[in-house]
Protein backbone atom coordinates (compact mmCIF):
# COMPACT_ATOMS: atom_id res chain seq x y z
CA UNK A 1 0.00 0.00 0.00
CA UNK A 2 1.26 3.47 -0.88
CA UNK A 3 1.56 5.91 2.02
CA UNK A 4 0.76 9.46 0.81
CA UNK A 5 2.19 11.07 3.94
CA UNK A 6 5.85 10.22 3.24
CA UNK A 7 8.14 13.19 2.45
CA UNK A 8 8.59 11.94 -1.13
CA UNK A 9 4.82 11.78 -1.71
CA UNK A 10 4.27 15.23 -0.20
CA UNK A 11 7.01 16.78 -2.38
CA UNK A 12 5.60 15.08 -5.48
CA UNK A 13 2.12 16.34 -4.69
CA UNK A 14 3.47 19.84 -4.09
CA UNK A 15 5.22 19.86 -7.49
CA UNK A 16 2.05 18.72 -9.24
CA UNK A 17 0.06 21.36 -7.39
CA UNK A 18 2.52 24.14 -8.33
CA UNK A 19 2.53 23.12 -12.00
CA UNK A 20 -1.25 22.93 -12.14
CA UNK A 21 -1.54 26.32 -10.41
CA UNK A 22 0.85 27.93 -12.89
CA UNK A 23 -1.12 26.57 -15.84
CA UNK A 24 -4.46 27.64 -14.35
CA UNK A 25 -3.13 31.09 -13.42
CA UNK A 26 -1.78 31.61 -16.92
CA UNK A 27 -5.15 30.63 -18.34
CA UNK A 28 -6.86 33.20 -16.13
CA UNK A 29 -4.49 35.92 -17.29
CA UNK A 30 -5.17 35.09 -20.93
CA UNK A 31 -8.91 34.88 -20.25
CA UNK A 32 -9.00 38.36 -18.75
CA UNK A 33 -6.75 39.84 -21.40
CA UNK A 34 -8.53 38.70 -24.57
CA UNK A 35 -11.72 40.79 -24.23
CA UNK A 36 -9.61 43.94 -24.12
CA UNK A 37 -8.37 43.40 -27.68
CA UNK A 38 -11.66 44.30 -29.40
CA UNK A 39 -11.49 48.09 -29.08
CA UNK A 40 -13.00 48.72 -32.54
CA UNK A 41 -16.17 46.84 -31.59
CA UNK A 42 -16.40 48.73 -28.32
CA UNK A 43 -16.14 52.09 -30.09
CA UNK A 44 -18.96 51.14 -32.47
CA UNK A 45 -21.19 49.98 -29.62
CA UNK A 46 -20.44 53.12 -27.60
CA UNK A 47 -21.74 55.34 -30.40
CA UNK A 48 -25.27 53.97 -29.95
CA UNK A 49 -25.39 54.03 -26.15
CA UNK A 50 -26.23 56.66 -23.58
CA UNK A 51 -24.16 56.70 -20.39
CA UNK A 52 -25.32 59.73 -18.39
CA UNK A 53 -23.47 58.78 -15.21
CA UNK A 54 -21.53 55.98 -13.54
CA UNK A 55 -24.69 53.99 -12.76
CA UNK A 56 -26.73 53.82 -15.97
CA UNK A 57 -26.28 52.81 -19.61
CA UNK A 58 -29.11 52.82 -22.16
CA UNK A 59 -28.49 50.97 -25.42
CA UNK A 60 -30.15 51.44 -28.82
CA UNK A 61 -32.22 48.28 -28.19
CA UNK A 62 -33.84 49.98 -25.14
CA UNK A 63 -31.89 47.88 -22.65
CA UNK A 64 -31.10 49.77 -19.47
CA UNK A 65 -28.03 48.49 -17.65
CA UNK A 66 -27.65 49.44 -14.01
CA UNK A 67 -24.36 49.05 -12.20
CA UNK A 68 -25.03 47.98 -8.64
CA UNK A 69 -22.32 48.52 -6.05
CA UNK A 70 -23.64 46.01 -3.49
CA UNK A 71 -23.40 42.25 -3.75
CA UNK A 72 -26.60 40.23 -3.86
CA UNK A 73 -26.52 37.96 -0.82
CA UNK A 74 -30.19 37.16 -0.47
CA UNK A 75 -31.26 40.61 0.71
CA UNK A 76 -32.92 41.55 -2.61
CA UNK A 77 -30.46 44.19 -3.83
CA UNK A 78 -30.80 43.09 -7.47
CA UNK A 79 -34.56 43.60 -7.15
CA UNK A 80 -34.93 46.68 -4.94
CA UNK A 81 -32.23 48.85 -6.51
CA UNK A 82 -33.48 48.38 -10.11
CA UNK A 83 -37.02 49.16 -8.90
CA UNK A 84 -35.81 52.49 -7.51
CA UNK A 85 -34.21 53.32 -10.83
CA UNK A 86 -37.22 52.18 -12.90
CA UNK A 87 -39.52 54.44 -10.92
CA UNK A 88 -37.41 57.56 -11.40
CA UNK A 89 -36.34 56.81 -14.97
CA UNK A 90 -39.93 56.01 -16.01
CA UNK A 91 -39.05 52.68 -17.59
CA UNK A 92 -40.15 49.08 -17.41
CA UNK A 93 -38.42 47.34 -14.50
CA UNK A 94 -38.14 44.18 -16.63
CA UNK A 95 -35.92 46.07 -19.14
CA UNK A 96 -33.25 46.76 -16.52
CA UNK A 97 -30.24 44.48 -16.48
CA UNK A 98 -27.97 44.50 -13.47
CA UNK A 99 -24.21 44.25 -13.53
CA UNK A 100 -21.77 44.49 -10.67
CA UNK A 101 -20.09 47.89 -10.46
CA UNK A 102 -16.32 47.90 -10.89
CA UNK A 103 -14.02 49.06 -8.13
CA UNK A 104 -14.28 52.85 -8.29
CA UNK A 105 -14.79 55.69 -5.81
CA UNK A 106 -17.99 56.61 -7.66
CA UNK A 107 -19.61 53.53 -6.14
CA UNK A 108 -18.59 54.17 -2.51
CA UNK A 109 -21.34 53.30 -0.06
CA UNK A 110 -22.10 56.71 1.51
CA UNK A 111 -23.10 55.16 4.84
CA UNK A 112 -19.97 53.04 5.20
CA UNK A 113 -17.42 55.16 3.34
CA UNK A 114 -16.12 52.26 1.26
CA UNK A 115 -17.32 50.21 -1.68
CA UNK A 116 -18.55 47.15 0.14
CA UNK A 117 -21.69 45.31 1.10
CA UNK A 118 -22.72 45.06 4.71
CA UNK A 119 -25.05 46.10 7.46
CA UNK A 120 -28.15 45.93 5.24
CA UNK A 121 -27.23 49.37 3.92
CA UNK A 122 -27.66 48.94 0.15
CA UNK A 123 -31.14 50.44 -0.27
CA UNK A 124 -30.61 53.09 2.41
CA UNK A 125 -27.22 54.08 1.01
CA UNK A 126 -28.04 54.14 -2.68
CA UNK A 127 -31.68 55.28 -2.58
CA UNK A 128 -30.91 58.96 -3.16
CA UNK A 129 -27.92 58.65 -5.55
CA UNK A 130 -29.83 56.22 -7.80
CA UNK A 131 -32.98 58.32 -7.84
CA UNK A 132 -30.87 61.34 -8.79
CA UNK A 133 -29.08 59.31 -11.49
CA UNK A 134 -32.43 58.13 -12.88
CA UNK A 135 -33.90 61.63 -12.84
CA UNK A 136 -30.86 63.05 -14.63
CA UNK A 137 -31.02 60.36 -17.32
CA UNK A 138 -34.77 60.89 -17.76
CA UNK A 139 -34.36 64.66 -18.07
CA UNK A 140 -31.59 64.24 -20.66
CA UNK A 141 -33.79 61.87 -22.68
CA UNK A 142 -36.70 64.35 -22.57
CA UNK A 143 -34.36 67.16 -23.64
CA UNK A 144 -33.02 65.04 -26.52
CA UNK A 145 -36.57 64.32 -27.72
CA UNK A 146 -37.54 67.99 -27.49
CA UNK A 147 -34.48 68.93 -29.53
CA UNK A 148 -35.30 66.25 -32.10
CA UNK A 149 -38.87 67.53 -32.49
CA UNK A 150 -37.87 71.20 -32.07
CA UNK A 151 -40.40 71.72 -29.29
CA UNK A 152 -40.19 72.93 -25.68
CA UNK A 153 -39.19 70.38 -23.05
CA UNK A 154 -42.31 71.02 -20.97
CA UNK A 155 -44.37 69.73 -23.92
CA UNK A 156 -42.75 66.30 -23.50
CA UNK A 157 -43.00 63.64 -20.85
CA UNK A 158 -41.28 60.33 -20.15
CA UNK A 159 -43.45 57.28 -19.63
CA UNK A 160 -42.76 53.53 -19.78
CA UNK A 161 -39.47 53.81 -21.65
CA UNK A 162 -40.59 56.37 -24.23
CA UNK A 163 -40.72 60.14 -24.47
CA UNK A 164 -44.06 61.46 -25.70
CA UNK A 165 -44.82 64.87 -27.19
CA UNK A 166 -48.09 65.75 -25.45
CA UNK A 167 -49.68 67.76 -28.28
CA UNK A 168 -48.78 65.65 -31.32
CA UNK A 169 -48.57 62.27 -29.52
CA UNK A 170 -45.23 61.59 -31.26
CA UNK A 171 -43.18 59.00 -29.41
CA UNK A 172 -39.52 58.06 -29.30
CA UNK A 173 -38.17 55.06 -27.39
CA UNK A 174 -35.25 55.62 -25.03
CA UNK A 175 -33.07 53.50 -27.32
CA UNK A 176 -33.92 55.76 -30.26
CA UNK A 177 -32.85 58.76 -28.19
CA UNK A 178 -29.68 57.19 -26.77
CA UNK A 179 -27.21 58.61 -29.30
CA UNK A 180 -28.66 62.14 -29.16
CA UNK A 181 -29.02 62.09 -25.36
CA UNK A 182 -25.34 61.13 -25.11
CA UNK A 183 -24.43 64.53 -26.56
CA UNK A 184 -27.05 66.49 -24.60
CA UNK A 185 -26.37 68.43 -21.40
CA UNK A 186 -28.67 69.84 -18.76
CA UNK A 187 -28.87 73.63 -18.44
Which residues are covered by each model-predicted region?
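N-terminal secretory signal peptides
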Residues: 1-12
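Short, surface-exposed charged micro-motifs
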Residues: 55-57, 88, 148, 153-155
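Flexible hinge/switch segments at interdomain interfaces of large molecular machines
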Residues: 56-59, 104-117
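Alpha-helical support elements that line or immediately flank enzyme active sites
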Residues: 64-99, 124-148
Amino acid sequence: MNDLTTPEAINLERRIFLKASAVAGGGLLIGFHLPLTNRAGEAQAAAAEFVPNAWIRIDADDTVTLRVASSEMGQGVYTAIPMLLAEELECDWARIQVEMAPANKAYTNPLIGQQLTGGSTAVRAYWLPLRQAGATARDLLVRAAAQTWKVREDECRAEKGVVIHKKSRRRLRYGQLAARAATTTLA
